[in-house]
């Protein structure tokens, strides 16, 4: 079975990369994994790379950007690059952050591995600080980062003006009553229970979240009821969705697997995923929307 060289110097086989999933017969046959495999084998780093369709077709436009195919390329390239890249051009990159990975580096040697460090290792010519927004370490999902100062400035303005649209999907403990609504709570950092936030209507900053119940389901083959919900945050406070879910003045149902605000019931991860991200491209001014449903 074929193996592939990865950016971190490791060599991984297809069964190792796909894990308990069946390895598709065509996996590794596309041009991008082959080119990256050869580059990493020679200890070369790509400066930039894109895939475009050349020619005419009823299904494709000439010079249309082609993201990695879902079935064959994406799992393979995510392992090779240590980043799940959904889109990249000369100005921006959109990635699917895995749970447990920091968005930006923290204090200490053990907190240097993060999305930013992996992007900078893969694209050495990008700016020193490419991040324009963050996800909690335990949250998975979509992040956009900037390669240039111009792109960083333009995207930052969009986040400040709240013209960026974000949607999350989560599993909440128990059965959430109602079809949807809006949660508005004020909260602040709790110095006595780091890194938790605490409800404080006097000194806290207000956060607003729109939510919609998607379905009620069982979880993990157990007699455990959970509710799948969609969140649209209108503000971007630290731990906003986690606290709005768990607090009795919010939904009163913590996110499954939340080590800070949860019930302690077993779960392999925090069941919170940034599933949709929409913004205006900082150079082309085209409105771009990326969607990726969670694996839970």
Language model regions located:
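RNA pseudouridine synthases
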Residues: 1-296
């Amino acid at each position: 079975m074929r193996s592939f060289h990865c950016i971190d110097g490791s060599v991984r086989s297809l069964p190792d990369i796909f894990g308990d999933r069946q390895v598709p017969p065509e996996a590794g046959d596309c041009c991008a994994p082959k080119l990256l495999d050869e580059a990493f084998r020679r200890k070369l780093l790509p400066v930039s790379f894109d895939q475009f369709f050349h020619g005419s077709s009823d299904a494709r436009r000439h010079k249309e950007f082609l993201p990695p195919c879902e079935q064959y390329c994406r799992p393979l390239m995510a392992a090779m690059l240590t980043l799940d890249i959904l889109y990249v051009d000369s100005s921006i990159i959109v990635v699917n952050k895995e749970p447990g990975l920091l968005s930006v580096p923290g204090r200490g040697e053990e907190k240097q591995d993060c999305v930013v460090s992996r992007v900078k290792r893969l694209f050495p010519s990008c700016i020193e600080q490419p991040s324009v927004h963050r996800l909690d370490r335990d949250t998975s999902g979509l992040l956009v980062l900037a390669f240039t100062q111009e792109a960083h400035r333009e995207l930052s303005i969009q986040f400040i003006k709240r013209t960026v649209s974000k949607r999350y999907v989560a599993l909440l403990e128990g059965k959430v009553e109602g079809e949807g609504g809006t949660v508005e709570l004020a909260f602040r950092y709790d110095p006595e229970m780091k890194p938790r936030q605490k409800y404080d209507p006097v000194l806290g900053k207000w956060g607003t979240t729109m939510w919609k119940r998607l379905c009620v389901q069982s979880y993990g083959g157990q007699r455990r009821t959970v509710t799948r919900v969609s969140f649209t945050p209108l503000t971007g406070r630290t731990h906003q969705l986690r606290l709005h879910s768990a607090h009795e003045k919010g939904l009163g149902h913590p996110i499954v697997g939340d080590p800070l605000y949860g019930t302690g019931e077993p779960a392999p991860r925090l069941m919170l995923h940034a599933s949709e991200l929409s913004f205006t491209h900082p150079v082309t001014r085209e409105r771009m929307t990326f969607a990726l449903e969670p694996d839970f």
